[in-house]
Design a protein with these regions (language model features):
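Conserved cytochrome P450 K-helix E-x-x-R motif and the immediately C-terminal K′/meander segment
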Residues: 17-36, 291-332
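Conserved cytochrome P450 K-helix/beta-meander segment immediately N-terminal to the heme-binding cysteine loop
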Residues: 66, 322, 344-371
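Cytochrome P450 heme-thiolate monooxygenase catalytic core
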Residues: 70-75, 93-94, 109-261
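N-terminal membrane-proximal hinge/A-helix region immediately C-terminal to the signal-anchor transmembrane segment
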Residues: 1-96, 111-124, 143, 155-159, ...
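Short, small-residue alpha-helix embedded
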Residues: 258-271, 403
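Cytochrome P450 heme-binding "Cys pocket" and the immediately downstream C-terminal segment
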Residues: 274-276, 373-375, 393-429
Length: 441
């Protein structure tokens, strides 16, 4: 006899859709508190199973990964944006693309990127005046776009930066889980969907313009874009410009926003915890002095590392991930039907008191070697895990640390909001602009 996981029955037909739309974060927390680590419910007509225990998560992402694909839920939501890019592609095609692109994120390449990251950060900070109030999350989104454009695609985004940032923001907002329209087909002409369609057209125009401009160059840099174009132009492959477009969209939309959020949440957390901030600043002074940070400095900055780790635990930019079972499966003592959508929320696991004492408090000092060794493998997974872990994990962590270090060398950040609140879009977005006053140090 099949034993389904426990969970809320919700309303007839709608199931738990309305409570999830109203507040997905509280809903996740309530499910975990009331029903445990494995919870089944109905959302928008789909069987959803929340899995929130490290042991089960490891089975899904590693041990039994072949039985859990990306699935129709993610394809319905994201297929328009990233097509067959790395995020959604599967099987042999995914393996080939992953192997093709992975070298661009090896240590040798990252070392070359580091100087560009610091240069772009200093250029952005040059626009700030001591005593002024800035919208930190917006500034950092512009910065990470500029860094990504220069390091991975070899072009200066300055002229199109504002348009590109607005386009990316509009696309992300289309997937705010707290809006009913998110669960409607993209072709339905709601105001949000119309804005989304315009943004998608803008995205495609920018990407194809970048491809055309690169092909017209006589001497182009050896970067991610060059690797992609060479693969498409190779007669031995079946890749097309549409493949190229999908991978560029995946990297841009998947990379710049999560990094900007990690930076935002690290800087605001430090601003609200003066003791932790003082420790990081003292470490930067001791190791760097007045020098710019380099990639070789990062191992000597453990307090900076802990500050970033703790911010990504407390406010994980990727707050959940999804899989779909491609056959009936057993998770723990429960049966999961074929075609169920699994939601695996970092939001719940990262705030679980079984793994993290005082889980809702920012405590970077918790990140000792002994503590990390004691953690279950998937109690902390800000970059997903298994063979499909984020391809840009090293790039994103290095970028976040270099940017935070560079900015702290120049400014103090006075957080202007009483506290952060969040919106569940493609990533963990601030519900309102993050205003900070910057003061030179």
């Amino acid at each position: 006899m099949s034993t389904l996981p426990p969970g809320p029955s919700g309303l007839p037909v709608a199931g738990s859709t309305l409570s999830f739309v109203r507040d997905p974060f509280s809903t996740y927390e309530r499910w975990a508190e009331e029903y445990g680590d494995i919870v089944a419910t109905n959302i928008a007509g789909r069987t959803f199973v929340m899995v929130a225990h490290p042991e089960h998560i490891e089975r899904i992402l590693v041990t039994d990964q072949q039985h859990y694909g990306k699935g129709s839920f993610q394809r319905d939501q994201l297929g328009d944006i990233v097509g067959d890019g790395l995020l959604l592609s599967e099987g042999e095609f995914w393996h080939e693309q992953r192997n093709r692109l992975q070298p661009e994120f090896f240590r040798e390449q990252l070392t070359q990127y580091a100087t560009m990251m610091v240069d772009e950060t200093r250029a952005r900070a040059d626009n700030w005046t001591s005593g002024e109030t800035i919208t930190l999350n917006s500034e950092l989104q512009h910065l990470t776009l500029a860094i990504m454009a220069r390091t991975l695609f070899g072009f200066d985004i300055e002229d199109a930066e504002g348009q590109f940032a607005n386009t990316a923001r509009t696309i992300s907002e289309r997937f705010n889980l707290s809006h009913v329209s998110t669960y409607l087909a993209a072709w339905i002409p709601t105001p949000r969907n119309r804005r989304y369609r315009r943004a998608m057209n803008n995205l495609d125009t920018v990407i194809y313009d970048v491809i055309e401009a690169r092909r017209a160059q006589d001497d182009s840099p050896n970067d991610l874009l060059a690797t992609l174009i060479a693969a498409v132009d190779d007669p031995e492959t079946d890749l097309t410009d549409e493949t190229l477009r999908d991978e560029i969209a995946t990297v841009i939309l998947g990379g710049h926003d999560t990094a900007a959020l990690a930076m935002t949440y690290t800087l605001t957390a430090l601003a609200r915890h003066p003791d932790a901030e003082a420790e990081v600043r003292a470490e930067l002074d001791e190791v760097l002095g007045d020098d710019d940070p380099t990639v070789t400095d990062l191992p000597a900055l453990p307090r900076l590392d802990a500050a970033v780790k703790e911010a990504m635990r407390l406010h994980p930019p990727a707050y959940t991930l999804f899989r779909e079972s491609n056959r009936p499966m057993k998770i723990g003592e429960y049966d999961v039907p074929e075609g169920a959508t699994l939601t695996i929320p970092q939001w719940v696991v990262h705030h679980d008191s079984r793994w993290f004492e005082s889980p809702w408090e920012y405590q970077p000092d918790r990140w000792t070697d002994e503590f990390e060794a004691s953690l279950p493998e998937y109690a902390y997974f800000p970059f997903c895990g298994g063979k499909r872990h984020c391809i840009g994990m090293r790039y994103g962590l290095m970028e976040t640390k270099l940017v935070v270090a560079t900015l702290l060398q120049r400014f103090r950040f006075d957080f202007q909001l009483p506290e952060l609140s969040f919106a569940a879009a493609l990533t963990l977005q601030p519900a309102e602009p993050v205003s900070v006053r910057v003061t030179t140090v």
